[in-house]
A protein has these predicted regions:
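Acidic, low-complexity intrinsically disordered segments
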Residues: 10-15, 21-275
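Short amphipathic alpha-helices and their capping/turn segments at secondary-structure boundaries
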Residues: 20-28, 123, 318-330
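Radical SAM [4Fe-4S] cluster-binding motif and immediate context
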Residues: 214-355
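Intrinsically disordered and other compositionally biased segments
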Residues: 6, 20-23, 302
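Extreme N-terminal basic, low-complexity initiation segments
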Residues: 2-10
Length: 355
């Protein structure tokens, strides 16, 4: 098929490598390989998925003089399903045997993303790193993490491997026992990722500067191949809903400056990106005033873009004025969150919606 034909003509996934230059060339500190793993599941749709945390770590490392390579298992490639005009779509799926624990599910289980041989070819083409950092998404996607670490171990031996992300934070003990990583980083990981790179290479980049999310640089969107970009207006969530792990992943609720978000979007627009997804857990917290400031900035600079809200928004935060502003600024996909129909539970979980 198309994949085989692409392989015959020597296609290999494109890797992007960047050494940071500022006002003057920064001292070379070392090479870091960042890996975004596969998804292992019964179904997976690309609703504007971008490894935002990993790309923020990439920016932190680059800003401190490291050479960064990103190997993205979810990157588009010849033979993969064609994306829709808004950037969303489907991933290439390799059907696998179902794990015993879910063997009863009447669906086809699979690995979503690059074929294994393409991953191995991309890994072989990348510069030999001093340290490897692997991201993780949903906890039950951990087989993708294990497969990535197994393959980077086979290629790079005892090069130190760090693992961060959602699975690493929520299932730390499981990750320590089963992932194969040398270090499991729980929490946001920006400072700890830089600290690990420094420890391995013998540098001191003062990683504690990145303990506060307000100090984080914009994600290095250009290091992955996507027809869209993810962004956040804020990190964390002010609510403490019992069914949600947001406060464990990011304990503090911190808003980014509206102008910084607009600058990030403008930079992506200059690279031809037109579709943007807000990843916020609480985009409309505070009656949507922060989102309104961002959208006003978009309009004042005449930026033409389309915005999507795959995480869902709290219905209570939408007013008539905000809805009209969202439409004028280009918000194209509006998803509203509904956790329960029980009025008592609606109030105890923050009153985000009423029915």
């Amino acid at each position: 098929g198309t994949l085989a034909a692409a392989a015959r003509v020597g296609f290999r996934p494109r890797l992007t490598r960047v050494t940071v230059l500022g006002d003057r060339q920064k001292s070379y500190k070392g090479k870091v390989l960042l890996v975004n793993p596969w998804i292992y599941d019964f179904a997976a749709h690309n609703l504007w998925i971008e490894p935002l945390g990993l790309l923020t770590i990439a920016s932190v490392l680059r800003d401190n003089g490291y050479t960064v390579t990103v190997l993205d298992c979810l990157a588009s490639h010849p033979g993969a399903p064609v994306a829709r005009t808004d950037g969303s779509g489907r991933f290439f799926k390799t059907v696998l045997d179902k794990p015993a624990t879910v063997a009863f599910v009447p669906r086809r289980f699979g690995r979503y993303g690059l074929p294994l041989d393409w991953f191995d070819a991309a890994l072989a083409a990348a510069p030999r790193p001093d340290v490897i950092l692997v991201a993780s998404g949903m906890t039950y996607w951990y087989p993708g993490v294990i497969e990535v670490i197994k393959r980077v171990r086979a290629r790079h031996g005892r090069v130190p491997v760090g693992l961060g992300g959602v699975y690493a934070t929520l299932c730390t003990e499981h990750a320590q026992q089963h992932s194969g990583a040398d270090q499991v980083i729980a929490g946001s990981g920006m400072a700890e990722a830089l600290r690990l790179a420094d420890d391995v290479t013998g540098n001191n980049s003062e990683p504690d500067r990145y303990a506060d999310p307000r100090s984080w640089p914009a994600p290095a969107h250009h290091l992955v191949s996507r027809p869209f970009a993810g962004t956040v207006a804020s990190w964390g969530c002010p609510y403490q809903c019992t069914y949600c792990a947001s406060h464990r992943l990011q304990p503090a609720f911190v808003r980014r400056e509206a102008g910084v978000v607009v600058d990030e979007i403008a930079g992506c627009l200059q690279r031809g990106i037109r579709d943007f997804a807000f990843y916020d857990d609480a985009l409309l917290a505070g009656s949507g005033r922060h989102l309104a400031a961002i959208l006003q900035g978009i309009l004042s600079r005449a930026l033409r873009a389309r915005f999507h809200t795959p995480n869902g928004m709290h219905a209570r935060g939408i007013s008539g004025n905000l809805a009209r502003l969202m439409r004028r600024a280009g918000v194209a996909t509006v998803r509203l969150s509904l956790e329960t129909l029980d009025p008592v539970r609606q109030q105890t979980t923050g009153g985000k919606v009423t029915t």
